Amino acid sequence: MPPDRSMPASASSSSAPEALPSACADCPSGRTLVAQGQCCQDFRRALGSFATGVTVLTTLDADGRACGMTISSFNTVSLEPPLILWSLALSSPSLETFRQASHYAINILAAGQQAISNRFASRVADRFEGVDSRPGLSGSPLLEGCCAWFECRHEAVYPGGDHLIFVGRVERFARQTSEAPLIFHGGAYARLATSED
């Protein structure tokens, strides 16, 4: 927090700095502050200022069962070779499934697929129930109606604080130019502006 500029400089400089708490009171885990005077919730809200697309990550587990979850931490790494990345919290129940997966698919959700995003972010027993999909190259489900699909082979995984960062090599992709993407911004869904807006 900047000093109070209404105070005389001499008074401001002679004041002892305000003691900062050693942990974030807003966090049940009591995590330490991410920056001086700022907590992890503030950090999360600031990150929410950056609009992202919404994706559903899918794969098959060791028993051949479909597994999927909503993520927004998707990005490109390289065009040659074609590499993408995404991250997953160490606390995620799906972490081991994706660590062991040799292949997975990234489904880029379209603007009308908010319900699918919510479903794959929920704790329902079968997230695929009522969702149309087809198997990809490796068997990973490709959700119907998406803007784009990236079928990937696991390339590498790196530690990243309280997350793991996964890098995938794209083996096949497809897109639908007629579909606008689903957008997430500031903790809520949004849509792209059109020329009429």
Predicted regions and their residues:
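Basic, polyanion-binding surface patches
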Residues: 2-197
